[in-house]
Amino acid sequence: MRVVAGTARGRRLEAPPGSVTRPTSDRVRDAIATALGSLGMVAGSEVLDLWAGSGAMGIELLSRGARSATFVERDRRALETIRGNLERTGLVAASTVARDDALTWCATGGRHDVALCDPPYVFDDWPALLAVVPAPFVVAESARPVAATDGWGLVREKRYGTTVVTFLRRQEQAP
């Protein structure tokens, strides 16, 4: 697994040991980052990487010009991997790594421009996540499409093998 583009292009990334995480493939990571770039959601953005695993998705966006990234992960081995990957890519200064449950962190965390959500495939509480996620734009990786709940609109949806990537934008509320 490698960083696909940007300042850390070609740098090797490690995956956490065991089967606790499911790293996003280089191809899918590149497609997500390119799509976000075309929507103006990368350069200068503050990224939230939930269920961060190896941190590869947030690192990809940092490499492509995101201002900062917060990585939220519960597994200790995955957190060690994220920290190592940030050191390997030279992106530590633009990063915060938090050990917490994603939903718990969202209820108390700061505001971000885009949230990257790659929970375990068994996760099915998208309405609860969308109710508390502190970002107006969400990229969800799941085994099936994520439905836009009240207050959210579907921007784009694409299937990559067994992974469905859903882009959602928070809708403006009328006064």
Report residues per predicted region.
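Class I S-adenosyl-L-methionine-dependent methyltransferase catalytic core
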Residues: 1-175
